[in-house]
Structure formats: structure tokens, C-alpha cells
Amino acid sequence: MNFIETARFRRAYKTLPEDAKLRVKDTLRKLDENFRHPSLQVKKIKGTKDIWEARVSLDYRMTFQVVRNYFILRNVGHHDPTLRNP
């Protein structure tokens, strides 16, 4: 699959500390290799239409949509704020 980054995702990614950026890159690699990789804990976000979350680390989450052969990366950041505004 291919990745499309929204402007919001790029802005949020730039604000992350370097260790979190490395974890995001690792998460994207795993997502590309196996959407259901156990460490990602991928699940749909309740109350949204086709928006998913993946675990980056204990504190960080990323949100995305799957459209055809693309992952549309929507947001990334600390767990609660990211999931409140996926």
C-alpha cells in the first residue's frame, strides 16, 4: 500500500520528539507489511466513519483511513488529543 500524508499529519509529525518520529516510521513499516500486526493494535475509532487508529507507543497514536490501495494518514500525537480529533 501507499501512504498519503494530510497537511495536519505533517504538521503534527513535525512537532513530535525524535524518538517518537522513529517509532512512527517503524509503525508505518509494520502497517505496510501487515495491517493487523499485533503490536499496532489497529481498530476502528468508535463514532467515526472508516477512521482507524494504530498504536505508535504507549503514549502515541496515529489515525488513518484506508481508501483503495492507500493509507491516508490523518493525525499523530499523544493518545487522548489524537483520538478526540482523529
Sequence positions of predicted segments:
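Enriched for short, Lys/Arg-rich terminal
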Residues: 2-4, 11, 18, 22, ...
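Residues in soluble alpha-helical coiled-coils and helical-bundle/repeat scaffolds
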Residues: 15-18, 36
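Basic nucleic-acid-binding interfaces
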Residues: 4-8, 14, 43-50
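Short amphipathic alpha-helical/adjacent loop interface patches that line ligand
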Residues: 13, 28
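A short, surface-exposed loop/turn module that caps and links secondary-structure elements
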Residues: 29-54
